[in-house]
Amino acid sequence: MMLRGVHRIFKCFYDVVLVCAFVIALPKLLYKMLVYGKYKKSLAVRFGLKKPHVPGEGPLVWFHGASVGEVRLLLPVLEKFCEEFPGWRCLVTSCTELGVQVASQVFIPMGATVSILPLDFSIIIKSVVAKLRPSLVVFSEGDCWLNFIEEAKRIGATTLVINGRISIDSSKRFKFLKRLGKNYFSPVDGFLLQDEVQKQRFLSLGIPEHKLQVTGNIKTYVAAQTALHLERETWRDRLRLPTDSKLVILGSMHRSDAGKWLPVVQKLIKEGVSVLWVPRHVEKTKDVEESLHRLHIPYGLWSRGANFSYVPVVVVDEIGLLKQLYVAGDLAFVGGTFDPKIGGHNLLEPLQCEVPLIFGPHITSQSELAQRLLLSGAGLCLDEIEPIIDTVSFLLNNQEVREAYVQKGKVFVKAETASFDRTWRALKSYIPLYKNS
């Protein structure tokens, strides 16, 4: 009885915190809505006024990823799931409109339903979960919402985290909740984790060890690509790049990265190098334009048909293209790695496209992976001492060195694909109808 009372108090406290966070964020949300037109289409679903409709019969599996990266890693999982369990209905949700847009492009053709995730206020999410009644809920990387989890468990669903990870800062917050007598993750049935570092972090939160399995990082998984050289030529032709031209791709760029790279780009284009600049957030394109214009760097926008036949820098102001574009590059930088608050993005996409990888010193979001990349010689970390232009120029002028990085990257990715097989085998053991058959 006492535990039940504590639980009710905590749920009320959780809802109050969500309301406070929403109120604090409201001015920024309204600004983005009015200036960039964001959130308008998803308001009804976010507030539970319109519920996702998943047609058909049969049990429902609900996959959830916070944003683009978490959603994309679900692709091979859903492909395998639909292949082996065709009688199940699939729902994919994301917290961001960009995540929903990418998910729609990828998963709707597979027969899945895609939706924004309703807000996790108990009064909203309870009715949504009750209507959909999922049999299995799979969270990508750990974007777990308490009321969502508890309502899913209340109706008898199995809940699972795949490719699980938790940052140091997040683990500190959850440890604080643990001291208050609440284990946030206790309703989750299982955790399939990226590495031993993540396992130790979850153990420190009081998660029983029998719920934790280290299956590896499935962001490393990519289906066999047998014609990368043809894709490379196709994209380079589309970009109007001469055969002997060098292309540097700056992926997932943030303001902190721009500060480091703008003077480098100035020097590179004087040496005849082309640069593809891909902002992490498309709505920040105007900021990129202003920076390039201020330094008198000629550029064009992808959305307006820009190519390298008349400008040395092309800014990609459309979403969902970065992973495809990497294949055209001679060298790729992954952004978010010059800001400790961001800690980097997907380091593996360039390797999967057989392009040499460089990144900045702040890789806290995937530090264990970055260390393994460096130890294997499959990636190069830019430091604060040697000028970036020296490192980049050396790599561009030495094809043998670049090729060595590519070969080590191929070995690394091939070895890491075993992670998907382990994850899939473990996931199947949690599928309700499968484990009882």
UniProtKB/Swiss-Prot annotation:
The chain crosses the membrane at residues 16-36. Changing V413L: In strain: Koala type I. Disulfide bonds: none annotated. Its EC number is 2.4.99.12, 2.4.99.13, 2.4.99.14. The active site is at E70 (proton acceptor). Changing V6I: In strain: Koala type I. The record marks E141, K219 as: Transition state stabilizer. GO terms for molecular function: Kdo transferase activity. GO terms for biological process: lipid A biosynthetic process; lipopolysaccharide core region biosynthetic process. Pathway: Bacterial outer membrane biogenesis; LPS core biosynthesis. It is an enzyme of class 2 (transferase). Changing T234A: In strain: Koala type I. It is found in: Cell inner membrane. It is a single-pass membrane protein. Coiled coil: none annotated. The keyword Cell membrane applies. Belongs to the glycosyltransferase group 1 family. Glycosyltransferase 30 subfamily. NCBIfam families: PRK05749.1-5. This is 3-deoxy-D-manno-octulosonic acid transferase. It comes from Chlamydia pneumoniae (Chlamydophila pneumoniae).
